[in-house]
Amino acid sequence: MDEEENHYVSQLREVYSSCDTTGTGFLDRQELTQLCLKLHLEQQLPVLLQTLLGNDHFARVNFEEFKEGFVAVLSSNAGVRPSDEDSSSLESAASSAIPPKYVNGSKWYGRRSRPELCDAATEARRVPEQQTQASLKSHLWRSASLESVESPKSDEEAESTKEAQNELFEAQGQLQTWDSEDFGSPQKSCSPSFDTPESQIRGVWEELGVGSSGHLSEQELAVVCQSVGLQGLEKEELEDLFNKLDQDGDGKVSLEEFQLGLFSHEPALLLESSTRVKPSKAWSHYQVPEESGCHTTTTSSLVSLCSSLRLFSSIDDGSGFAFPDQVLAMWTQEGIQNGREILQSLDFSVDEKVNLLELTWALDNELMTVDSAVQQAALACYHQELSYQQGQVEQLARERDKARQDLERAEKRNLEFVKEMDDCHSTLEQLTEKKIKHLEQGYRERLSLLRSEVEAERELFWEQAHRQRAALEWDVGRLQAEEAGLREKLTLALKENSRLQKEIVEVVEKLSDSERLALKLQKDLEFVLKDKLEPQSAELLAQEERFAAVLKEYELKCRDLQDRNDELQAELEGLWARLPKNRHSPSWSPDGRRRQLPGLGPAGISFLGNSAPVSIETELMMEQVKEHYQDLRTQLETKVNYYEREIAALKRNFEKERKDMEQARRREVSVLEGQKADLEELHEKSQEVIWGLQEQLQDTARGPEPEQMGLAPCCTQALCGLALRHHSHLQQIRREAEAELSGELSGLGALPARRDLTLELEEPPQGPLPRGSQRSEQLELERALKLQPCASEKRAQMCVSLALEEEELELARGKRVDGPSLEAEMQALPKDGLVAGSGQEGTRGLLPLRPGCGERPLAWLAPGDGRESEEAAGAGPRRRQAQDTEATQSPAPAPAPASHGPSERWSRMQPCGVDGDIVPKEPEPFGASAAGLEQPGARELPLLGTERDASQTQPRMWEPPLRPAASCRGQAERLQAIQEERARSWSRGTQEQASEQQARAEGALEPGCHKHSVEVARRGSLPSHLQLADPQGSWQEQLAAPEEGETKIALEREKDDMETKLLHLEDVVRALEKHVDLRENDRLEFHRLSEENTLLKNDLGRVRQELEAAESTHDAQRKEIEVLKKDKEKACSEMEVLNRQNQNYKDQLSQLNVRVLQLGQEASTHQAQNEEHRVTIQMLTQSLEEVVRSGQQQSDQIQKLRVELECLNQEHQSLQLPWSELTQTLEESQDQVQGAHLRLRQAQAQHLQEVRLVPQDRVAELHRLLSLQGEQARRRLDAQREEHEKQLKATEERVEEAEMILKNMEMLLQEKVDKLKEQFEKNTKSDLLLKELYVENAHLVRALQATEEKQRGAEKQSRLLEEKVRALNKLVSRIAPAALSV
């Protein structure tokens, strides 16, 4: 039991520790609430909190207090007390509170209930049980309460450890049930031999016929197990059970071993199963033989017993029916195997429910008539029913006894409670009676006082208010005094804070002085080094002699100082031992040696003679220089290593990226080369088609002259239509291309990978190239960019070729018609061609030499209608970008075929002329003009404008005078000069400026092109006689009439041929437009890639420059390292010389020790000040608590005043009652007056009647009497009325005074509340001030800690200096003999 209780207590402690968040072993209110919620004690939570914590919100409890309070609360809730008389009910309540853990048929496992014994055994063992229960009464109620909080985990653990014990419990209970049921012996008639467990077990063994020798074998143990319902045990389980019971290992189980194993849980008690486990042995084991004559008697007795009973109560669910499987299962438990045949023999269906009452009567009938098997089944049923009912009756009897005991205990407790409640009620009644009497007496006195002495009460109220006001004023003065004291303390704390800040400032100043002294020492050290390291010093020998003398003197002084230092150290240790421990400085060391802060001691002792002064500070500076040098060296080495690693990583990354870019560039270049080859093939095909068309045009030009006349307007009309369609289509294609290009550019602008791609394109295709090749590649790129104005060269070639073809046709036609007109026309051709070329070549590369023949090139390549001029401003940058891309893709020697095309055309034109001087023989001016006009420039615009204006202002389109070839050459030379000048400006300017100039040139030239195209279209629609000039009209009048018919036929034929050729030409133009658009897109892409390539090249150059700069810095750092190594060697040699001067440290050791003592004293003073601050803070907290208490007192006073105010209100209400009574009496008196008046009137009326009857004298007398009586009555009424009015006024004045008093009291209370609020605000302000003081104190403590840390650092440095002094002394002792010997 103790182990089980300890287990529960340990579980409770684990839950308790899980709620202990602070780890202190105590729980506050919140943590205790959380613990109760974990233990599912929501109902007991308020009682438990009140029991453990009370009304204190800051109280805490430990585990023992919680355990005691927890058990007490649970026991009080359950109605259980730790007493002798209710320990058994605790045990029964604890056993019945926990349900079984596992149910298997009729077996229940895991319950801790203890089966009750029979009444006789209980009566026999009641005395020892009471003794054992008395020994366990101290913890039974605790276990009952602790079992309620047992976790499921502990139940599962306990289940595994106590499984065997539970089985033994069930076995023990089954033994008793078997003993009572199978053999028909009721529990009340148990023999005395079965009073003990040993006798019961021995009796069972005798009944089973086993254990005759006092021991059980394995087979006999199997029989016993079958008898108690464990017939399903296998051989291995039986062997394990036998080995467990056989503790001595002799191969047998004795009675004591069996009893010990059976009652191992609690051997002092014979336990009984909490559930009814039916014995499963065969019915034949205890069946009464049929031969004996006891069968009928047994049956009759059973029938008589069961005549008023129903069978199958255990399986009856209240409906009177049961499943056949249930009946068969019950019979199989009783050992009857052929239950199905029995049911069928009794005419019951196996598939439907069985009526239990009919089955009972059938069995009852069959019990007397049917054979032995049916009788056995009936007997088994009756036996089972009787045993079940008997168990139920016994259980009810036990429950009745327990309920009776519980009722008796409850009645006892109720009696005690009733007594306590009677006492409480009596005391409460007495108190209430006393209070009521006291209140009645007080109210009576107050009523009497209010009725008689209202003025006195008012004075009393005024006096009370005055006293309260004085008390409040006194409280306010006291609080003001406390506030003044707090302010004084605050000022003191602020002063202390300022003082500490000043001390910190002084320490900082001292540190700055030490730094300045260090700088001074460094200068001295440099001076000494300069002086000492001079090899040509003349006084070196004399100085060594003086050094020897000085060393001897210093040795003597060192001995004296060391003796004195020892004496001071001894005195210091004595003083240190006398000091209290709590005032010791944390930075004190027992050896008593301290170091002075740098710069606080003397400057040192200098050497004699002419040598520079060398002090101890110089030595310190040398040490610092060495340390600084070492730090610099390590930092430099780390930086050098870091930069080397970075440079190596950069090189690796650069090589990797360069290889990737080379590969990607190779792939891109291969793709671009393939595209370029395709475009060249397409260009060659288009040139072939153009040449074929030109030849066809030349063939048609050699035909008869009338054919040319009819063909010209058709050609012009067809070409105008083609030009318009081509212009609209090309404009649409350009818009789409521009939209796609802008989208691609916006998308590609965010892709950094394009930059790598362009860089790869710029790299050479085979491995890394030297810088010379890269430079040459950049030059080539710049040259290609400079050749951007030649982007429209091929279009110019096509325009020139077409214009020349038209010109050849016109020349041939004019030659056949009229020689002079043809000559004039041929002379005008070069001029017109140049003028048109200069006016239109700059925008689209067009060169139409005659207005009538310019439609084809305009329709092909450069549409110039009004729509184009409207979009000139928006399309200018895109045309420039297309020209730039074409310039980048077209190689440098590309202009050669362009100049070759016009030369061929001029060579074809030469034989057609009349004279050799008419047509120029050199084609260079046209090539030059074409090349010059293609380049954009602002300087060319005035010339082009003047030429265009001159050509437009002429009176006629065809000039008859001849122009020599010299004028053409002059114009070509001027154009060549313009081209060179623009080339120079291009080389000087940037690419952006050139593009802007080109845009301006295009904008200036497009209106001319537009006017020209409109004029051409207008002329194409006019009749032939309006299109030609005056010479042409004169030529037409000279034609003969017979030739008109032939010319018409020939013209119709040529017209049909030209229509077919025009259709074919239109298809070719469409294909060329598609290819040109594709080529322009490719050129744009290539131009963009080339720009990105240039940017990446720039980045690459910058990265290389950075690498070169890093390499140069690396070389400089290496040089610095070498210089520092040399300096280090030099410093080592200098240190060997400076080590001789360490003797000067001995003079300053005493001063350092004194300074350390001073610092220790300052630290002790700081500690004392900190203690004072703590004391002041405690005082402030106490004063704050007093202020809070005073505030609480004032709140209590306010509550008292409120109570008095309520009393006054009640008195006012009580005064209102007499006021109402007085008003009622006044009304009654008024009614009486009215009644008197009525009576008076009646009396007067009667008197008048009597007067009439009475004589006049008598009447006069009566009048006088009546007047006298009336006056008296009036006086009395007036007096009564005045009295009533006075009373009313007095009551009204009292009420008003009471209301005034109430108002004054309310005002006073409000003033007090306001004052208390102000006081509370002041208290909060004082709290804030206290918090600020705490913060300042914390800052001061931190500053003190910092000073202490500095002091510790000074002590450490002093120790280091002492060690250095020792080492220097050793060095001096070694060096001094050598110096003296020299």
UniProtKB/Swiss-Prot annotation:
Residues 150-164 have a biased composition (Basic and acidic residues). The modification Phosphoserine is found at S148. One of its GO terms (cellular component) is cytosol. Residues 991-1004 have a biased composition (Low complexity). Residues 384-424, 484-579, 616-699, 1046-1375 form a coiled coil. GO terms for molecular function: calcium ion binding. InterPro entries: EF-hand-dom_pair (IPR011992), EF_Hand_1_Ca_BS (IPR018247), EF_hand_dom (IPR002048). Pfam families: EF-hand_7. Transmembrane segments: none annotated. Keywords: Calcium, Coiled coil, Cytoplasm, Cytoskeleton, Metal-binding, Microtubule, Phosphoprotein, Repeat, Ubl conjugation. Ca(2+) binds at D246, D248, D250, K252, E257. Phosphorylated by PLK1 which disrupts its centrosome association and interaction with gamma-tubulin. GO terms for biological process: microtubule anchoring at centrosome. A motif (KEN box) lies at residues 495-497. The keyword Calcium applies. Residues 144-164, 857-969, 982-1006 are annotated as: Disordered. Interacts with gamma-tubulin and TUBGCP4. Interacts with anaphase promoting complex/cyclosome (APC/C). Interacts with CDC20 and FZR1. Isoform 2 interacts with LCA5 and USH2A. Isoform 2 interacts with DZANK1. The KEN and D (destructive) boxes are required for the cell cycle-controlled NINL degradation by the APC/C pathway. This is Ninein-like protein. It comes from Homo sapiens. The gene is NINL.
